[in-house]
């Protein structure tokens, strides 16, 4: 089992913040708490860590602004509250992060943005670009248009999907409880706190309770569901209390929290998903030079593609076939079939002139590709030969 490590040793962290932490039912936004939270985020970024925030609170904040009554809201009421609250929430994050000269970027997702491959790739590219320029993506479900049939249902699971989408190696769920207990502690005074969870078993799932606040849709059950999504994709998860000011600093200073161990690594888990669960929609036939490049761990460029077969869309899975007619790799293609045919055999610098838009340099990026066992073995032999040369 992978051991727990300090936050500073992670590469990319997704932080989910519950509504009850950000919004007081009567007083509205908890500005002082948010400022302290953003100072924590600035501290992580100063250490070179990518930080993404999945922030609940739009409906809760809009509810406060509109002075809606307590209790369950009708769908149209919650969507109206989200429309009002999302503006205020984005402004609050932007203002607090700007205190440390950090730019915030708002992203509102719906279920299809992570479940449909084409939209998934587009959302991931946008998030990665924000991280590349040093911004902090502030992500929330688009509650104004989401319905009960087409929604994540809670931001715990949304945060887990964002973590897997972006290859994060840590997901932190901040809530009004400090971690996982063997039973709901407010119901069972003898409940035992669990500091480390090596694997999410049926017994672990049975320990989850329900939501504790009208401002929040989630509860321990949704956090365990999020843990299953994250850990099986190679991402560790922490459940911790967000009640103290500077909750991330509190975690670093030893505050009690539950740590869920990952299985594998984010890249390994995603490549297993590509190789084993998706059927190729087409084929890219490549030359010997491309085979050598892929064996060295590089992306597939249009120049190495000899021909294209099949009908596919950007984001679909395609098989990469070598000169001998054998599949040597499989991956998510960056272009529709028609455009792929037009740029096959051409240099990446020519793409914009041919297609009329600046597409991606790689036909299949190495992060979206898994090599066949045969090519992996050949690559390993080449590395060993080079080492002994």
Swiss-Prot record:
Enzyme Commission number(s) of this protein: 2.7.2.11
Disulfide bonds: none
SMART domains per record: PUA
A Pfam family recorded for this sequence: PUA
Binding residues annotated for substrate, in chain numbering: 56, 143, 155
Cell location: Cytoplasm
Keyword Disulfide bond tagged: no
Binding site for ATP: 16, 175-176
Swiss-Prot/TrEMBL catalytic activity: L-glutamate + ATP = L-glutamyl 5-phosphate + ADP
InterPro entries registered for this protein in UniProt: AceGlu_kinase-like_sf, Asp/Glu/Uridylate_kinase, G5K_ProB, Glu/AcGlu_kinase, Glu_5kinase, Glu_5kinase/COase_Synthase, Glutamate_5-kinase_CS, PUA
Domain PUA, residue spans: 281-358
Annotated pathway: Amino-acid biosynthesis; L-proline biosynthesis; L-glutamate 5-semialdehyde from L-glutamate: step 1/2
First-listed, main subcellular location of the protein, grouped into a coarse class: cytoplasm
Keyword Phosphoprotein among record annotations: no
Cellular component, GO annotation: cytosol
UniProt cross-references to PROSITE patterns, sorted A to Z: GLUTAMATE_5_KINASE, PUA
HAMAP family reported for this sequence: ProB
Protein role: Catalyzes the transfer of a phosphate group to glutamate to form L-glutamate 5-phosphate.
Entry's family note: Belongs to the glutamate 5-kinase family.
Descriptive protein name: Glutamate 5-kinase
């Amino acid at each position: 089992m992978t051991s727990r490590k300090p936050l500073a040793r992670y590469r990319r962290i997704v932080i989910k913040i519950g509504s009850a932490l950000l919004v007081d039912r009567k007083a509205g936004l908890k500005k002082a708490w948010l400022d302290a939270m953003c100072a924590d985020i600035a501290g992580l970024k100063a250490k070179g860590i990518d930080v993404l925030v999945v922030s609940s609170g739009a409906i809760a904040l809009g509810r406060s602004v509109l002075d809606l009554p307590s209790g369950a809201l009708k769908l149209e009421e919650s969507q109206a509250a989200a429309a009002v609250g999302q503006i205020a929430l984005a402004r609050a994050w932007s203002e607090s992060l700007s205190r440390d000269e950090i730019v915030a970027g708002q992203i509102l997702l719906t279920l299809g943005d992570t479940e449909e491959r084409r939209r998934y790739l587009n959302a991931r590219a946008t998030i990665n670009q924000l991280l590349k320029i040093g911004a902090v993506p502030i992500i929330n479900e688009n509650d104004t248009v989401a319905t009960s049939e087409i929604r994540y249902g809670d931001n715990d699971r949304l945060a887990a999907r964002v973590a897997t989408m972006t290859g994060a190696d840590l997901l932190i769920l901040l809530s009004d409880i400090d971690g996982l207990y063997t039973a709901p502690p407010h119901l069972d005074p003898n409940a035992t706190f669990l500091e480390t969870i090596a694997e999410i078993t049926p017994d672990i799932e049975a320990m989850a309770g329900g939501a504790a606040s009208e401002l929040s849709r989630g509860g321990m059950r949704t956090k365990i569901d999020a843990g299953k999504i994250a850990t099986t994709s190679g991402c560790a998860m922490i459940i911790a209390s967000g009640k103290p000011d500077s909750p991330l600093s509190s975690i670093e200073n030893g505050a009690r929290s539950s740590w869920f161990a990952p299985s594998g690594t984010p890249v390994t888990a995603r490549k297993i998903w590509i190789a084993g669960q998706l059927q190729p929609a087409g084929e890219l036939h490549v030359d010997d030079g491309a085979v050598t490049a892929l064996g060295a761990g590089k992306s597939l460029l249009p120049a190495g593609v000899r021909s294209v077969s099949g009908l596919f869309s950007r984001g679909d899975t395609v098989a990469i076939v070598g000169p001998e007619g054998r599949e040597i790799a499989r991956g998510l293609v960056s272009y529709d079939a028609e455009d792929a045919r037009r740029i096959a055999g051409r240099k990446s610098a020519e793409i914009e002139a041919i297609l009329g838009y600046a597409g991606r340099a790689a036909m299949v990026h190495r992060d979206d590709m898994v090599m066949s066992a045969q090519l992996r073995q050949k690559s390993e032999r080449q590395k060993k030969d080079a080492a002994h040369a």
